[in-house]
Amino acid sequence: MCIRDRYYLGPSPAREGQVIGSAGPTTSSRMDKYTPEMLDKGLKGMVGKGKRSPEVIEAMKRNGAVYFAAVGGAGALLSKCIKKAEVIAYDDLGTEAIRKLEIENLPVIVVIDKDGNNLYETAKEKWKK
């Protein structure tokens, strides 16, 4: 099994002519329980919003993975970057189903790099002054 990248989202239903409905990021920490194992099996990139646990950050460093943040509240705009969406598991979960997505030019920023440098922490220190 090849696990490459994950975008944590719960899209709204697609309207006629749309690939997917509004597709903004969801809180990534809800997946922290499962993430270290996925990283150990080959996951290299994650897109979502919010902080990650110390266990996830350690697993990212161990596996050379990166965590990107997408802007919350911009789901309608972000959905335009999704060129193809296919439900591949748990169709009965509706918007929470697992999808294979083809994405182009998704505007994200690196918030935790492969070395564990964490923008959420460094920015807090910088702007505290």
Feature map (PLM): residue ranges:
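C-terminal binding/interaction regions
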Residues: 80-129
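Ordered, amphipathic secondary-structure segments that act as subunit-interaction surfaces
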Residues: 7-50
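General beta-strand structural signal in soluble alpha/beta enzymes
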Residues: 7-9, 46-49, 67-70, 89-90, ...
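Short, small-residue-biased leader/transition segments that mark boundaries at the very start
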Residues: 1-3
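Hydrophobic alpha-helical bundle architecture
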Residues: 40-41, 46, 50-66
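Short, ordered loop/turn segments at secondary-structure junctions
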Residues: 12, 50-52, 65, 71-75, ...
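Solvent-exposed alpha-helices and their adjacent loops that cap or buttress functional pockets
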Residues: 31, 36-40, 58-61, 70, ...
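Short glycine/serine/threonine-rich phosphate/pyrophosphate-binding segments
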Residues: 29-31, 49, 53-58, 75-77, ...
